Amino acid sequence: MLNIGPFSFHSRLLLGTGKFPDFDVQQKAIDVSEAEVLTFAVRRMDIFDAKQPNLLEKLDVKKYTLLPNTAGAKNAEEAVRIAKLAKASGLCDMIKVEVIGDDRTLLPDPVETLKASEMLLEEGFIVLPYTSDDVVLARKLQELGVHAIMPGASPIGSGLGIVNPLNLSFIIEQATVPVIVDAGIGSPADAAFAMELGADGVLLNTAVSGAKDPIKMAQAMKLSIEAGRLGFEAGRIGRKRCATASSPLEGMSVVE
């Protein structure tokens, strides 16, 4: 089970809802992924205008936990305003904090992310900050009392996969809250690797919505995350420089 604050989920796959070709493909991909948590950008959806069609109208929202995010925020104050808008609309108190500090790389602003997380915790939100693979920043966020850490594998939408597995492993080893690898996942192998490192979950979007067949990719991601978690729990063998025979040598007959 993936436990985040008061919530418990069977699926360790969190799925973003943007960039799908159409609502039908989106719905089918969500269904086969078996994701229980769906994230969306509040600023890209007019949640107060009943005339504007959006995700919330198309989905049976009772089946899912919705995770609004603060994408588009440039500072802590903007992130808090967006989070409060989501809460005022009757959505979940759980919020993904996303404060971008650089438009080219879309990497998060560490100072504003810390500030926004602290402010939202004081407001009673369940806070999941998107952060870089900075080990010290992850620890400081954890010390604030956030409910999960969401380090990026690589820049948002890049599909580069996990570019710094060492840092991710350090973040996971020191964590006392769930670690959900977020951003940059490009393939099922990337998702499985994140889980093999010991991540508690993976959040992805473009890897599915941008695939040639988003529905098949959603299923592939589901299976790879399950396989990666099983592999982590099973415990991989150690790496060795030299070969070790897989068959015992004792009792073998000698051919003369």
From Swiss-Prot:
It comes from the Bacteria. InterPro entries: Aldolase_TIM, Thiazole_synthase_ThiG, ThiG. GO terms for cellular component: cytoplasm. It holds the Pfam family ThiG. The active site is at K96. The keyword Transferase applies. Keywords: Cytoplasm, Schiff base, Thiamine biosynthesis, Transferase. GO terms for molecular function: thiazole synthase activity. It catalyses: [ThiS sulfur-carrier protein]-C-terminal-Gly-aminoethanethioate + 2-iminoacetate + 1-deoxy-D-xylulose 5-phosphate = [ThiS sulfur-carrier protein]-C-terminal Gly-Gly + 2-[(2R,5Z)-2-carboxy-4-methylthiazol-5(2H)-ylidene]ethyl phosphate + 2 H2O + H(+). Pathway: Cofactor biosynthesis; thiamine diphosphate biosynthesis. It is found in: Cytoplasm. GO terms for biological process: thiamine diphosphate biosynthetic process. The keyword Cytoplasm applies. Gene3D superfamilies: Aldolase class I. Its EC number is 2.8.1.10. 1-deoxy-D-xylulose 5-phosphate binds at G157, A183, G184, N205, T206. Belongs to the ThiG family. Catalyzes the rearrangement of 1-deoxy-D-xylulose 5-phosphate (DXP) to produce the thiazole phosphate moiety of thiamine. Sulfur is provided by the thiocarboxylate moiety of the carrier protein ThiS. In vitro, sulfur can be provided by H(2)S. Homotetramer. Forms heterodimers with either ThiH or ThiS. This is Thiazole synthase. It comes from Bacillus cereus (strain ATCC 10987 / NRS 248). The gene is thiG.
